[in-house]
Amino acid sequence: MVTYQTQPVVFQLAGYSNSGKTTLMTKLISALNSDGKMVATLKHHGHGGKPDLLQNKDSSQHLNAGAIASLVEGEGRILLQAERQSWSIQEQIQILAQLQPDFILIEGHKQEDFPKAVLVRRHEDLELLSNLKNIVVVFYWDMEIIKNDSLLGKNAFHIDDPVGLIWIKEFLYQMKNTNK
């Protein structure tokens, strides 16, 4: 039996450190989950170097011995650790797509060309609005920072405005319906 699986919708949250990406991401994940949607996330490790391994675990020892990947499963949870020179964003998305989520949400990877929300906390963050591609919505912390900026348009919300989260959900559902 062949089943047809649509590709997941990919959406980004971009902004500098401490701009509220993780907080907005967790709210969006919870909102989509409450609608019965499956979400996978991809996070850029923006602190330089490799993310930490799970220390003192057999799987980490396997990697340290030279395995290119180690997958641990228990009661339906999988932890995958893999080593190689680098992973393109497309390869990371392909890995997550195997889990058949409705949505793949990316935190970071600012320069990628997926539809994105940009978070502006400080005046210096405004340069993101002219330097990034495919911005569909902006979240700001202080109206004074963005009030004279002509790049914002109508899809701009205060970081605490629940209408912004609703706007993203509706945008994602439109993309999902277009993807069918």
State where each predicted segment sits.
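Phosphate/Mg2+-binding loops and adjacent switch elements
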Residues: F103-H158, P162-T178
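Glycine-rich phosphate-binding loop used to anchor ATP phosphates in small-molecule kinases
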Residues: L79-V120
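P-loop NTP-binding site
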Residues: L32, I95-Q98, N177-K180
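Short, hinge-like loop/turn segments at secondary-structure boundaries
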Residues: N56-Q61, S88-I89, R122-E124
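Walker A (P-loop) phosphate-binding motif
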Residues: M1-H47
